[in-house]
Amino acid sequence: MGIKKPFEISLEVNDSCNYSCEFCFGKNSVDKRIDLSREQAKKVIEKIAAEGIERIRFTGGEPLLWPHLQEIISFAKQQGLFTSLNTNGSLFSKESAKELAPVLDDVLVSFHALNDKSEQQLCGQKGLFDKKISAIKDLANQGVFVRASTILSGQNISALEEFNKTLE
């Protein structure tokens, strides 16, 4: 019984983030921020494609802060890979959604809370929830398959139904 090759590889392109979430281990890091170089990313993608792995997921920190994101996602697409992006969603605009849509198959937008007030308390900024909802709409309007993720707890489970209605 051999080990099967992975179906998907996650590539962490940076560890920078535009949030300061109270629960995140990265917010207190005193180390220099790390960005994957364009050349390193291309080598990894070539290796993934050569090994017959079908999917690549771009993660971070916040991958939309990485200056090479569009170029490298396009490169992955040219290699025949299914491309996914994990993001907090706050940096998307109608323009960036339109630019990335042709090379993105799937986007996962993370919600740390189920409403704007709670998101602000956890992440230290106002209006983040609405930015995420706007990003989802912009991406979906461009034909990108968009998913939302969140963590449920005893503190927020009562807001789940309202959250689902918002996403519809």
Question: Regions from the language model: what does each represent?
Answer:
Residues 2-39:
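Canonical Radical SAM [4Fe-4S] cluster-binding loop centered on the CxxxCxxC motif
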Residues 11, 58-59:
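Catalytic metal- and UDP-sugar-binding loop of GT-A-like glycosyltransferases, i.e.
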Residues 35-58, 66-168:
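Radical SAM/AdoMet-radical enzyme domain recognition
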Residues 62:
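Conserved G/P- and acidic residue-centered "switch" motifs that form tight phosphate/ATP-binding loops
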